[in-house]
Amino acid sequence: MAKADTLPVFLKSITIQGFKSFADKVKLELGQGLSVVVGPNGSGKSNVADAIRWVLGEQSAKNLRGSKMEDVIFSGSSVRRPVGMAEVSLFFDNSTGIFPLEYQEVIITRRVYRDGEGQYFINRSSCRLKDIHELFMDTGAGKEGFSIIGQGRVEEILNLRSEERRTLIEEASGITKYRMRKREALKRLDETEHNLERIRDILAEIEGQLGPLEEQATIAREAVELTTEQKALEIEIVAFDLKEVRHKLTTSVQETEELQSAIAAAVADLSQKESEILGNKVKLNLLDEQIQKQQETTYQLDQAVNQIVQELRLRQEREGYLGEQINRVTTELSSHEEKVRQSTEQLRALEDRKALLHKTLEQANQALAADEQRLAEAKARNGLEEIEILRGSLSHLQSKLAESTAELNRFTHQLATLNSTHEQLVKEKKDKEAALFSHEQQEAQVQEQLKAQEELQTDIRLQTERAHQETAQLREQSKAGQRELQELNRDLEKKSARYHALKNLEDSLEGYQRGVRELMLAKKKNQPSCGDLCGTLADLLQVEERYEVAVEVALGAGIQNIVTETERGAKEAVHYLKSHNLGRATFLPLDVIQGGKATVAKEAAQDPGFIGVAVDLITFAEKYRKAFESQLGRTLIVTDMEAATRVARASGYRARIVTLEGDQVHPGGSLTGGSLQRKGSNLLGRSREIQELRQECDERRTQQKEMELKAGALGTQIQKGEENLKHLMGEEQELKSALAVLRTQELNLRAQAQRIHEEVTAIAARMAGIEQERDELQSHKALGAEEQSKLTDSIQEAQEALARQEEKNRQASREMEQLQERLTQTKVQAAKWEQELKQAVERLAQDQALLGENKHLLERKRKDLQDLEESKARLAFEQGDWESRRREAGEQQQQAQEVLIALRKEREVLSKELMDQESLAQKKRQEQQTLEQKLHNLELKTARWDAEWETGSRRLLEEFDLTWDEAQTYQSERNRAELGARVQEIKLRMELLGPVNQAAIEEYPKLQERYDFLSVQKQDLEEANESLQQLIAELDKTMSERFEEGFIAVNEAFKVVFKELFNGGYAELRLVDPTNLLDTGVEIIAQPPGKKPQLLSLLSGGERALTAIGLLFALLKVKPSPFCVLDEIEASLDDANVSRFAQYIHRLSDSTQFLVISHRKGTMEAADVLYGITMEESGVSKLLSVQLEGQDKDTRTA
């Protein structure tokens, strides 16, 4: 598929960087032949066609498959950041001179940044998009030609209406430039006709103005001479009046200075007094703080003294208690010592008794042994052994019974003693526990009272601190309120003075001409001749402050024009002025005055500096509309002079234009401007300022009353706060005393409860010991009772046996009975002594145990006595230290009281001095207020004189453009009456002249000159109109001829291409209206092989697509493009049609350079160079190229 070296190479290369998926810079080198770009779906191959379309000037983001132009910039990927710019360049071969540039190579570049800024370049030089369009015009290339054809273009051809399809023929016929020239010519023709109509209207208007204006100019020249003389006379009059006012002001200045000096001295003196008062108040506050601190110190010392006294009282009570305890323990010790002595003596007596009983028992036992020996001998003799045995056993049993009875009696006695002691201890313990419970309850109550009092003290302390803070805050608020009230009073005085000055000016109608002033004053007095007057324009309108200057300048002297209900009322007012020689005035009768507003040109109304028609920017009663429209209806208001010149130009210099700063552009183009010397309030602003001042003064007075009420309320609050603070401090002091008493009670109760608790513990211990001893005795008693019962039974049995035996042996010998009796008595006596001995031993053991216990108790009491004596001695030793502390605290307390009394005396002296100073300061204030009132009255007069001076000076400046110094040069030897008489003569002459148009002097020659100029322009425009109509007719003829030629050529080519693409068949283009070649539509008739002729819309999808492609190829044949980009236009074709499509474009590549974007195999097979677009990296396209020559392939990465 190699091509000859003579094949055209128009588009040499393409560079793309940052455009859509081409993040990195890539370059496509386009050689001869057919180049095909291939790649998988989504790889970005169609972005190449978008890049070419974009650089050729595509402005629709939708056509580039985006929502906004910034979407063409690479937006980043998962691994790459977005770039800030997209740039595409096309390199063209211009060796054939297809472009009208003196370069062999032409580079077209387009660049866009992320902020939306775009740039175009031709050979690296910045240019306009229009320059690029003109460069490609009628070259066959370009965005609107056939150099870029996508699948969408095929669909577009298929869906175009017949009227729209003719544009394809027009492009191929090369009449686009004629169509553009015709549009420009029609636009110019429309503008020319519009200008011509406007000039005709202006000329007609001027023709009606020239005659009257010439007459007005003659009158105006005479009026100018009279006005000049009148001006000089009025200047002299104003200067005369100002001289008198100046003299008054000079005198006023001297008096003001004297009053100000006196006020300054009074202020200084008052300031010094107030400074002294403030210093004394500061000292008083410091004294209050010192007194408060001293009170706190005194209170703390009182507390300390109370605590020491309380401690001393507690110690005295403790010492008394210890004395009582010592006495009690001493008594108990003596009792225990007596018990020990008695126990010792009893023990000694018992031991002696024990020894005696032991000796007697031994003697009895010896006697008993002898008697038993003799009895045994007797029994042996008498056989009474058994009786003796029984009697011995009985005796032994009886002895045991006696012992058991004695022991039981002892146990019973001891138990009775223990029970009595236990009952006494139980009662004593109950009494002690009841006393302990009572003390504990009392202590708990005291603790609760302490807690409540402490909480109350904390609450009172917090309330006291809060009261201190609130009182201090209220004092600060009071001081701040006084300062604000003083500032408010000063501001109110200033505003009130300004208000009264302006009100006086308004009431006296200062600023108005004499005639206007006299008429309005007469109307106020209900003068019959003035009953028809409505008021001046200044009185009848309201305007926002920002428009005041503009409206005042727009009205000029007309601001003093008087509106009347009827023309008759105006004439009556004129007669009144003449009859009383009161000057002149201008009237606007509502029944004859003509209103109307200027029509604002559309271009002028759309100007950003245009604000509106002057009459629309003011507010007035509807009945006065015609009056205001007559003065302001033809005046436009704009922001500044630049806007004024633009609006004047847009409105053809027919309207009067005023800026917000007062500069003017007059009809015809003349300008008036400069600085405005506006001193004080003007007529428009004065009423507004009076209203504002009245409102501000009312607001200040309301604020004054509110602040005075607030100050009174604060004073009441401060007084209540101080009373509350005093009350709280008293309560706090009472609470501190009550707390000291409660704490003393708590300590006493705690000490007594501790003592009782110790006694209860000791009683409980004794009771436990008694209970244990009683349990043991009861156990022994139970055993003894059981043994006694057994012994009684045994004795009874022994007695019965003995009785039986005795009954048997009653007849024994009398010797044996006597012996037995004596033996029995001896045994009984021996048993008795033995029992006594045993009891003595037991009693001795008990007494020894009791003696040990008494000795132990004696030692413990001695130890308690020693501890008590040591405690008492320690208390006695510490008593002196506490007495010393009490004396020292009492001295400190006395000193603190003395300091507090001294501080209070000093405060009383300082308070009296402060009251005297405040009384003197009040007198100084009254003196100052008297001086300030005098100064205020003088300032009011001065303000009135200043207003008169300002009015006169402003009149000099605004009416005569003179300063006071310059006006003094006009003074002559004539007095004021002579000057006034001459002014009246001039005014009479001016009345005879009637209305004077001063501007006519300058306007007439200018209007004549403008009339001549516009007449010449009218002639030129008529000639231009005729020339443009002739040009349009020639362009229509040329376009019709060229369209017809192009249609025939495209139709013939279409027939041929259709047959080649379909391998037969027939197709043609038909005109919908052959008689109207400029607007006729174009229909496509096709007859594929084997089918009948039918419209394009009736064919199958593949046939319609191939037919549309055939039409595109026919257009290319008629008007070949140096290069052509085809973006997947064969996508809907089958393989056979794709092959025919590829073969056909291969043949066309002899005259046209093709770059085809495709994924069809047949197209790729026909390619000379293949470019592969891949996306190895997500979201980033990469370019590969393959040069095909036979079977050799050279692959490289671009």
Swiss-Prot record:
<dbReference type="InterPro" id="IPR024704">
    <property type="entry name" value="SMC"/>
</dbReference>
<dbReference type="GO" id="GO:0007062">
    <property type="term" value="P:sister chromatid cohesion"/>
</dbReference>
<dbReference type="GO" id="GO:0005694">
    <property type="term" value="C:chromosome"/>
</dbReference>
<comment type="subunit">
    <text>Homodimer.</text>
</comment>
<feature type="coiled-coil region">
    <location>
        <begin position="687"/>
        <end position="1042"/>
    </location>
</feature>
<keyword id="KW-0238">DNA-binding</keyword>
<keyword id="KW-0547">Nucleotide-binding</keyword>
<dbReference type="InterPro" id="IPR003395">
    <property type="entry name" value="RecF/RecN/SMC_N"/>
</dbReference>
<dbReference type="InterPro" id="IPR027417">
    <property type="entry name" value="P-loop_NTPase"/>
</dbReference>
<dbReference type="GO" id="GO:0003677">
    <property type="term" value="F:DNA binding"/>
</dbReference>
<dbReference type="GO" id="GO:0007059">
    <property type="term" value="P:chromosome segregation"/>
</dbReference>
<dbReference type="GO" id="GO:0005737">
    <property type="term" value="C:cytoplasm"/>
</dbReference>
<dbReference type="GO" id="GO:0005524">
    <property type="term" value="F:ATP binding"/>
</dbReference>
<feature type="binding site">
    <location>
        <begin position="40"/>
        <end position="47"/>
    </location>
    <ligand>
        <name>ATP</name>
    </ligand>
</feature>
<dbReference type="GO" id="GO:0016887">
    <property type="term" value="F:ATP hydrolysis activity"/>
</dbReference>
<keyword id="KW-0963">Cytoplasm</keyword>
<feature type="compositionally biased region" description="Basic and acidic residues">
    <location>
        <begin position="803"/>
        <end position="818"/>
    </location>
</feature>
<feature type="domain" description="SMC hinge">
    <location>
        <begin position="534"/>
        <end position="647"/>
    </location>
</feature>
<dbReference type="GO" id="GO:0030261">
    <property type="term" value="P:chromosome condensation"/>
</dbReference>
<comment type="similarity">
    <text>Belongs to the SMC family.</text>
</comment>
<protein>
    <recommendedName>
        <fullName>Chromosome partition protein Smc</fullName>
    </recommendedName>
</protein>
<dbReference type="InterPro" id="IPR010935">
    <property type="entry name" value="SMC_hinge"/>
</dbReference>
<keyword id="KW-0175">Coiled coil</keyword>
<keyword id="KW-0067">ATP-binding</keyword>
<dbReference type="InterPro" id="IPR036277">
    <property type="entry name" value="SMC_hinge_sf"/>
</dbReference>
<comment type="function">
    <text>Required for chromosome condensation and partitioning.</text>
</comment>
<feature type="region of interest" description="Disordered">
    <location>
        <begin position="785"/>
        <end position="818"/>
    </location>
</feature>
<dbReference type="InterPro" id="IPR011890">
    <property type="entry name" value="SMC_prok"/>
</dbReference>
<dbReference type="Pfam" id="PF02463">
    <property type="entry name" value="SMC_N"/>
</dbReference>
<feature type="coiled-coil region">
    <location>
        <begin position="175"/>
        <end position="211"/>
    </location>
</feature>
<feature type="coiled-coil region">
    <location>
        <begin position="322"/>
        <end position="524"/>
    </location>
</feature>
<dbReference type="Pfam" id="PF06470">
    <property type="entry name" value="SMC_hinge"/>
</dbReference>
<dbReference type="GO" id="GO:0006260">
    <property type="term" value="P:DNA replication"/>
</dbReference>
